[in-house]
Amino acid sequence: MNHLPMPTFGPLAGVRVVFSGIEIAAPFAGQMFAEWGAEVIWIENVAWADTIRVQPNYPQLSRRNLHALSLNIFKDEGREAFLKLMETTDIFIEASKGPAFARRGITDEVLWEHNPKLVIAHLSGFGQYGTEEYTNLPAYNTIAQAFSGYLIQNGDVDQPMPPFPYTADYFSGMTATTAALAALHKVRETGKGESIDIAMYEVMLRMGQYFMMDYFNGGEICPRMTKGKDPYYAGCGLYKCADGYIVMELVGITQINECFKDIGLAHILGTPEAPEGTQLIHRVECPYGPLVEEKLDAWLATHTIAEVQARFAELNIACAKVLTIPELEGNPQYVARESITQWQTMDGRTCKGPNIMPKFKNNPGKIWRGMPSHGMDTAAILKNIGYSEADIKELVGKGLAKVED
């Protein structure tokens, strides 16, 4: 396979990934591959560009390092070109409503006829099979959260609230990335392709597993948080200091012993309700739970965030200031690790945003390109798989492909 023009870098150099999907979930998977060195081709509709393009800034992050192909993959010669592209593809990711690709004639078996080693990842709200009531329904972030039991666990005691921004999309995209890599590892061992069925609601079901297990195995339903505090354990969650908010986790024998001395509760240590060796204080089951919260709130309210951080560092209590967005890039840890970076957009502007993560020591990722325009790489990609200028012109003339203006 001849690769498209791009630098060689990262742990996935030489891997070709193609994705068809809009907005966040599937493209996030593609973005991870692209930032780790894979050659990633982004398929867009010929008539209508990805709706993410209407956003002023986010697409510059989410579509960096990609190659843009505008092709009607379901019709006539456009379908033929897509299947020819699959012959040189390692991983194909698609996001749609249920088995939409199969309904339109592009089944796993058809894809494997063209490439027996292809890894196929299907990403949808409710999966590739199940009941007709759900399988073919559209789904976005909040839909997956609501159907999975994840949303109902979040928010405040008075009302559930979906965690933002777009948690289910990002979790599902990362699941597609890791599952596809696992499948690719096996394919290189066996030579046999794989198809992966990723239902967004099942991803969120798994992400919401912690408290669910108490219900499935005992009927206990965990209450939601109160003002950002852990529903079960005192000293865990969001707290207000004299000049802002922190989060903390009061966990550990030594940590509890020393913290209780500071807040005036040393006398309860060693009692039947808080015996020696206590590592967590249950907010409800421990009679002292409400008192711990009361004393901790009072102590924190009289100290600044800096004072609390300094003292908790001495006591080895996990704690962090709740940073505002403007505070991020000036934070010394962000600066030291270059967590925020800059890159050039295709029109020559400078864009600022999160850097590549995680950080590979021996084969680091790289930002080598901004977001491509609609159809920017169509001609180059089609030439790469054997199409002539005349062939490409014919596809464009029939409305089956779009090249950059």
UniProtKB/Swiss-Prot annotation:
Q: Which GO terms describe its biological process?
A: carnitine metabolic process
**Catalytic residues as annotated in Swiss-Prot or TrEMBL:** D169 (nucleophile)
Cellular component, GO annotation: cytoplasm
The pathway to which it is assigned is: Amine and polyamine metabolism; carnitine metabolism
Record's Gene3D superfamilies?
Answer: Crotonobetainyl-coa:carnitine coa-transferase, domain 1, formyl-coa transferase, domain 3
Subcellular location as annotated: Cytoplasm
Write down the chemical reaction(s) this protein catalyses: crotonobetainyl-CoA + (R)-carnitine = crotonobetaine + (R)-carnitinyl-CoA; 4-(trimethylamino)butanoyl-CoA + (R)-carnitine = (R)-carnitinyl-CoA + 4-(trimethylamino)butanoate
The EC number on file is 2.8.3.21
- Which Gene Ontology molecular-function terms are recorded? L-carnitine CoA-transferase activity
Query: Organism's domain of life?
Result: Bacteria
Give the protein's function.
Answer: Catalyzes the reversible transfer of the CoA moiety from gamma-butyrobetainyl-CoA to L-carnitine to generate L-carnitinyl-CoA and gamma-butyrobetaine. Is also able to catalyze the reversible transfer of the CoA moiety from gamma-butyrobetainyl-CoA or L-carnitinyl-CoA to crotonobetaine to generate crotonobetainyl-CoA.
> Subunit structure, briefly?
Homodimer.
Annotated family: Belongs to the CoA-transferase III family. CaiB subfamily.
Protein name per Swiss-Prot or TrEMBL: L-carnitine CoA-transferase
- Originating organism: Salmonella gallinarum (strain 287/91 / NCTC 13346)
